[in-house]
């Protein structure tokens, strides 16, 4: 966070969130996860630039392209190994950050992509350095995701694509100012747990983490931060809340809620060189996060079970 702010990167919170997401107890796992996160970020940034360049002037085609891309990432992510699946989720998330962040100004897509890639790379380097300094043990064999049952990858692709399409339709009709962020969160939640054996439970856990992270992040931003806060003061305020998220990630039983908590907390607290105290904007962004996760839960609960009733063989 200090380096991101010193380098005057646009959104230091993404660098801090990257550290939290790639930090795992084992040095081996940390390096592998960081590698796949970097690959996912680079591919996602490139895909985001291409999608904006091709479809930014055609909103409906743009929404369809993002939905198909989400479905493709979820489909492939279900069929590959654990950290490769994670990379696919981050690929779409980065594509969404670039695409939705620059669709109103397509000429700025490359700048957005470069900024996000730099922030993620900085976070990975910091997490890697910390892993080397404080590594407790090494693990020779990585954990692999269970092989998907026949048809599971296809169903997960449908889930993710339809979640993005439903959110996009609401954004298109309502013209909600934070609609792009709402769509981004709906797709991200659907993809992060696409290959999870208990998708609904995992996503509900993430939602609980989102709620807690949002509340604590807003509390920090509007009650504890001051307009003249130095980096040292911001660090002292943030430290106990970041430690809470890190402890949650270290326990497999709380990784889902901790993932949601860390993302929501960093987005809501929004630490930066120039702090923003726009309460209305912060509440709108918080609503977009929470409703986005609810859309993905609806996709898990409602969209595929109907299909399963018609095709009991799982195909």
Question: What are these regions, as identified by a protein language model?
Answer:
Residues 1-315:
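A transmembrane helix-and-boundary motif of multi-pass membrane transporters/channels
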């Amino acid at each position: 966070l200090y380096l991101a702010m010193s380098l005057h990167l646009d959104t230091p919170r993404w660098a801090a969130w990257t550290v939290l997401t790639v930090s795992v107890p084992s040095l081996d796992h940390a390096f592998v996860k960081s590698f796949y996160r970097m690959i996912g970020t680079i591919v996602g940034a490139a895909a985001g630039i291409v999608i904006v360049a091709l479809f930014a002037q055609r909103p409906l085609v743009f929404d369809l392209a993002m939905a198909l891309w989400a479905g493709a990432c979820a489909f492939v992510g279900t069929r590959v190994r654990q950290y490769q699946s994670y990379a696919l989720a981050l690929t779409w998330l980065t594509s969404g950050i670039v695409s939705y962040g620059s669709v109103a100004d397509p000429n700025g897509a490359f700048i957005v992509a470069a900024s996000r890639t730099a922030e993620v790379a900085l976070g990975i380097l910091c997490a890697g350095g910390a892993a080397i300094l404080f590594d407790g043990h090494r693990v020779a064999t990585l954990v692999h995701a269970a092989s998907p049952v026949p048809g599971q990858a296809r169903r997960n692709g449908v889930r993710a694509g339809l979640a993005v399409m439903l959110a996009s339709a609401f954004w298109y009709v309502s013209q909600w100012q934070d609609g792009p962020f709402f769509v981004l969160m709906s797709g991200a939640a659907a993809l992060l747990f696409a290959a999870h054996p208990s998708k609904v439970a995992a996503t509900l856990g993430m939602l609980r983490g989102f709620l807690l992270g949002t509340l604590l992040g807003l509390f920090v931003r509007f009650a504890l931060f001051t307009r003249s806060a130095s980096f040292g003061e911001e660090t002292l305020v943030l430290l106990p809340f970041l430690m809470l998220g890190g402890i949650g990630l270290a326990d497999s039983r709380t990784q889902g809620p901790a993932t949601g908590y860390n993302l929501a907390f960093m987005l809501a607290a929004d630490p930066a060189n120039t702090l923003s105290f726009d309460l209305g904007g912060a509440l709108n962004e918080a609503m977009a996060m929470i409703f986005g996760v609810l859309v993905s839960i609806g996709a898990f609960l409602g969209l595929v079970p109907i299909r399963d009733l018609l095709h009991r063989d799982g195909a």
